[in-house]
Amino acid sequence: MAKPTSRNDRFALFFITLIFLILTVSKPVASQNCGCASDFCCSKYGYCGTTDEFCGEGCQAGPCRSSGGGGDPAVSLEGTVTPDFFNSILNQRGDCPGKGFYTHDTFMAAANSYPSFGASISKREIAAFFAHVAQETGFMCYIEEIDGPAKAASGEYCDTEKPEFPCAQGKGYYGRGAIQLSWNYNYGLCGKALDENLLASPEKVAQDQVLAFKTAFWFWTTNVRTSFKSGFGATIRAVNSRECSGGDSTAKAANRIKYFQDYCGKLGVAPGDNLTC
């Protein structure tokens, strides 16, 4: 005959069961930060989304929002990047390959299909983004790197130590698009995020006007945005760290700072501190 369970034993069993339930219920919530799509944020509570509620304070993963290096408020991307502002950046030389390729309409089309870029963005961050675009493309003059094919032929931009992103024969992974996406691993990761096989067809970035901006948005939200909370200088290091090492490249970093200050002026916002890298 089984020994009757005492009141103390029943209480201990209830307490142990309660602790077990708390632990097992809380784990799935915490683990949700691995389940969001690449262009969605995981909130501090473990849910996916693209607004400030998800990408703001406490954001655990994804394209989390920063304070913009100075806490300036979020603005409407469409209302801030007007045709006049956009066109003021364009290089108006008649021989520019990018003339007619980079347009305000295609910029907005790309932003609408990649909502996490502009869902909660500040004027200062907009100025920072376009400062890097201006430097990388010559004020949106160049669609692809001038000497890119020659560099690709010599084996540059193909990192063989990343076998998960194999370089396709006859393909070059040199700079293309609004922020000059480079290297096989970036083409691979970006292509996966955008559902495009960019490892097999990297040239698509220089052929598709919307994709040329979407790759820039991907690079920005994945590699640059979180650095911006430390000031513009940190974004220079994130985009091209070689420009922070002195020598001739220092002039290019100075250009980025100048453009950033100029665009902040156009948008009526202070550039903040920590401009250099």
Curated annotation (Swiss-Prot):
Signal peptide: 1-31
Active-site annotation: E136
Disulfide-bonded cysteines: C34-C42, C36-C48, C41-C55, C59-C64
GO molecular function: chitin binding; endochitinase activity
Catalysis performed (reactions): Random endo-hydrolysis of N-acetyl-beta-D-glucosaminide (1->4)-beta-linkages in chitin and chitodextrins
One of the GO biological process terms: systemic acquired resistance
Induction: Accumulates during senescence and in response to 3-amino-1,2,4-triazole (3-AT) and silver nitrate. Induced by viral infection (e.g. cucumber mosaic cucumovirus, oil seed rape tobamovirus, turnip vein clearing tobamovirus, potato virus X potexvirus, and turnip mosaic potyvirus). Induced by pathogens.
Assigned EC number: 3.2.1.14
Keyword field: Carbohydrate metabolism, Chitin degradation, Chitin-binding, Disulfide bond, Glycoprotein, Glycosidase, Hydrolase, Plant defense, Polysaccharide degradation, Signal
Chitin-binding type-1 domain ranges (all copies): 32-66
Gene Ontology, cellular component aspect: apoplast; secretory vesicle
Record-linked InterPro entries: Chitin-bd_1, Chitin-binding_1_CS, Endochitinase-like_sf, Glyco_hydro_19, Glyco_hydro_19_cat, Lysozyme-like_dom_sf
Sugar attachment sites: N274
Cited PROSITE patterns: CHIT_BIND_I_1 (PS00026), CHIT_BIND_I_2 (PS50941), CHITINASE_19_1 (PS00773)
Annotated spans, Catalytic: 75-277
Disulfide bond is among the record's keywords: yes
Family, as annotated: Belongs to the glycosyl hydrolase 19 family. Chitinase class I subfamily.
Protein name: Endochitinase CHI
Source species of the chain: Arabidopsis thaliana
Organismal lineage: Eukaryota, Viridiplantae, Streptophyta, Embryophyta, Tracheophyta
